[in-house]
């Protein structure tokens, strides 16, 4: 029997996703493929900065179960009021013995409108994490009942002027349902959408091992 994906009933959830590098010229074809699917879906476009913060070495000495290569804090704030202006602080934890970034522990906190960016950054700084880098993501998001599929472009904005532009496709299992699935069932959903997106080069062989954090960390 395949292992059950466990989830604590709180703001915490298990993230189960795969990522693929892709040329940005495939965006229109990607959207056409998704639009032709008969399943009910919702589309959202979001863009804006993501600020990444890292823990100091002493923190990992006291929390040896977590891997520095995949444990961090992210502050996300959409531009132009997109996504209803929802801002979010996310703590992501990768186990030290994990072989990939497909399954990670994640804690999400949605912020109130009156919470300022300065307040968030000051609080993160006082908690011990330090700013490491920033990126801007332009995301075309399709939410299905079993997964979310995203085509997004990333710009590195850490030093001001945008550089290092990359594009990716991401398939993430619905976070509210993944805890009730076996790992085999979760992989079946990933494979289903890989087959759908195979015309633009999305397949199991193209799954990336590194997270965005590992790609852009300074």
Q: Where are the regions that the model predicts?
A:
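Mixed-charge, glycine-accented linear interaction segment located at domain edges/termini
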Residues: 175-215
